[in-house]
Amino acid sequence: METFPRTIFDDVHQQFRSTFRSWLDNEVVPHHEEWEKAGITPRELWLNAGKQGFLGLNVPEAYGGGDTDDYHFAAIMAEEIGATGVIGSANGITLHNDIVLPYFLGLANEEQRARFLPGMVTGEVIGALGITEPNTGSDVAGIRTTGLKKGGAFIVNGAKTFISNGINSDVVIVVCRTDPEKGHRGISLLLVERGMKGFERGRNLDKLGMHAQDTAELFFSDVEVPAENLLGEEGNGF
């Protein structure tokens, strides 16, 4: 019996907690040490999480998601990941759900939603957010990566570092300067996809902890990103 019982979780939340904890105990905990040594989790884990409904709980049902904006579920996932000691192995899932997906839900147009969200719910498409840079850290106003317009595309050049999900990711929201003359008002968000020419991944960085969370360097050399991969309005990335 809890000394100070919490009242913020109802029966549905607690049922979800039990289901998620069981999944962690059976599918993640037994492999955690192996993945920590490997420095990455297998893509099969993502597909498994998607199959169980643990990805995209906040995504509309039309795209296969859980269609709920109830933050309690995210809180429960964070609590249970911490309680089982598998933060390195499961942190990428919370990043995908709670940091990357809200960008799509808040800024993506209908074509982008239809193209990316179903796969992000099933685990076939893993997301990452590219802000931090080697020389500027996470100072968004000071980023140096550029995405200059050329015809019907943006040409991206620059580098990012310490990017969580950097190795596994299939789509990266890259914060870059599309108009260097406008300061922070010239910053935009571009969706850079796996396989685009000139997009390379560097080292999977060796960290002090959370080793199974792949954290990488990303390099962009004249990457041609089509205009339809602009997320939100041009110049509103800051």
Where do the PLM segments sit?
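A short, Trp-centered hydrophobic/proline-enriched beta-strand micro-motif
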Residues: G123-I131
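A short core secondary-structure module
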Residues: A153, N157-R201
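A glycine-rich, basic-preceded beta-loop-alpha segment at the flavin cofactor/substrate interface
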Residues: R194-L205, D214-F238
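Hydrophobic, small-residue-rich alpha-helical packing segments that form membrane-like cores
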Residues: T136-D139, F154
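Internal helix-loop-helix
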Residues: K51-G123, N165-V171
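A structural signal for short hydrophobic beta-strand segments in well-ordered beta-sheet cores
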Residues: T145-L148
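Intrinsic disorder at enzyme termini
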Residues: M1-V12
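Glycine-rich phosphate/pyrophosphate-binding beta-alpha loops
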Residues: N97, G137, T161-G166, M210
